[in-house]
UniProtKB/Swiss-Prot annotation:
Its main location: cytoplasm. It is found in: Cytoplasm. It is an enzyme of class 3 (hydrolase). It comes from the Bacteria. The gene is ung. Keywords: Cytoplasm, DNA damage, DNA repair, Hydrolase. This is Uracil-DNA glycosylase. PROSITE patterns: U_DNA_GLYCOSYLASE. The keyword DNA damage applies. Coiled coil: none annotated. One of its GO terms (molecular function) is uracil DNA N-glycosylase activity. InterPro entries: UDG_fam1, Ura-DNA_Glyclase_AS, Uracil-DNA_glycosylase-like, Uracil-DNA_glycosylase-like_sf.
Length: 216
């Protein structure tokens, strides 16, 4: 199965015209992130048949030169967001690799679907595009990955992500849960949770190639 088939299935069962119209107006009259051409970049960089890991975020970063369509990732020369810095600290503690770029395209190309549950946001207004239809779309994406792929690791950081557990078949996938890597919660159990090594150990146990989390 390919993303085109997944999207066709979703759009035949749900009407996204109101969301489409809303976004057309928003992109015309407001500053919206990411750039329109990057809204679906997570799907462009991670083919459906290559998915090994899903990391769920919430909505895109709402500052300039940050969001580019991948959850938690920012553009190459942007300042490190605090959550990403904590993700990298845990990466170093977990498997000993030090990353210097805030850009996660290499993870996406390794089969890590970096999926926000809302794919657009107005500049400076966090959560401004909630409840326009994105949640329906991304819930269906999670369900499709669960239904049609085997032995995927779903990494759910924080309560909003963990509410999506109901869409995942735990008999054939691994779910890794911990507090969110944001500074507000990282010390409540994110640090020390070892999501990267746990993911790779599971993938290897299923005969899959582990993720190259470190910069090559």
């Amino acid at each position: 199965m390919k993303w085109s088939e997944v999207f066709h299935d979703i759009t035949t069962r749900h009407d996204f015209q109101a969301m489409h119209d809303f976004l057309e107006k928003e992109y015309t009259t407001q500053i919206v992130y990411p750039d329109k051409k990057n809204i679906y970049q997570a799907f462009d960089l991670t083919p459906f048949e290559d998915i090994k890991v899903v990391i769920l975020g919430q909505d895109p970063y709402h500052g300039p030169n940050q969001a580019h369509g991948l959850a938690f990732s920012v553009q190459p020369h942007a300042k490190f967001p605090p959550s990403l810095r904590n993700m990298y600290q845990e990466l170093e503690n977990d498997i000993g690799c030090h990353r210097t770029s805030p850009h996660l395209q290499d993870w996406a190309r390794e089969g890590v679907l970096l999926l926000n549950t809302v794919l657009t946001v107005r500049q400076g207004e966090a959560h401004s595009h909630r409840n326009i239809g994105w949640e329906t779309f991304t819930d269906e994406i999670i369900q499709a990955v669960s239904n049609y792929r085997e032995h995927v690791v779903f990494i759910l950081w924080g309560r909003p992500a963990q509410q999506k557990e109901r869409f995942i078949d735990t008999s054939k996938h691994l779910i890794i849960k911990s507090p969110h890597p944001s500074p507000l919660s990282a010390f409540r159990g994110f640090f020390g949770s070892k999501p990267y090594s746990t993911t790779n150990n599971y993938l290897k146990s299923k005969g899959k190639t582990p993720v190259q989390w470190c910069e090559s």
